[in-house]
Amino acid sequence: MRIGILSDSHTETELHREAIEQLIGEGVEYLLHAGDIMLEEHLKMLAETNLPYVCVYGNNDMALIPFNGQYNIFQEPYYFTIEELKIKMMHMPYFMSADADMVVSGHTHLFESELKGETLFINPGEVCAREKPLSECAIVDVIENKFNVTHYFKQLGQASWTKREVEV
């Protein structure tokens, strides 16, 4: 199973589109967005991929509340299952107990990936390139209950993404 993860798109529509295209080009089967989506246009882009997707509200997503029920966006922490993988997703990294197979967060704008016991904690970094001149996203491959994490990042102004396999 191949899961694409992004967070913190903010108002950077082109970077949001490019991150989604990168993840789709890498063959993801699911998309997760860990909040600070900010624009309905960004939710539409996720929905229009025709891939199963799940989003959580971030601290800057008040304008998206009227679209509750129209898109797959939920309050944090949101628990759900993909195939047999139990996932907890939030924007703010406040609910960090290991009560799921994978815990996804955003907000810090920093890529992080750590396996604690049998739980993968992952923050894909920032799509918006606000804190640093990098747009980021991640892919988690789940193979026989093992996690393989790949961090994708692109310097602003560059056409191609850099791929980095991450030890977990």
Regions found by a protein language model. Give the residues of each.
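N-terminal active-site segment of His-dependent metallophosphoesterases
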Residues: 1-48, 62-64, 68-69, 134-136, ...
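A short, polar/proline- and glycine-enriched secondary-structure boundary/capping micro-motif
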Residues: 16, 98-101, 133, 157-166
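Conserved beta-sheet core of the metallophosphoesterase superfamily
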Residues: 54, 81-152
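Active-site metal-binding loops of divalent metal-dependent hydrolases
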Residues: 7-11, 35-37, 59-61, 92-93, ...
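Charged phosphate-binding loop/patch that engages nucleotide di/tri-phosphates or the phosphate backbone
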Residues: 142-168
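Non-catalytic interface/targeting segments
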Residues: 1, 71, 76, 159, ...
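Helix-adjacent hinge/juxtasegments
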Residues: 50-95
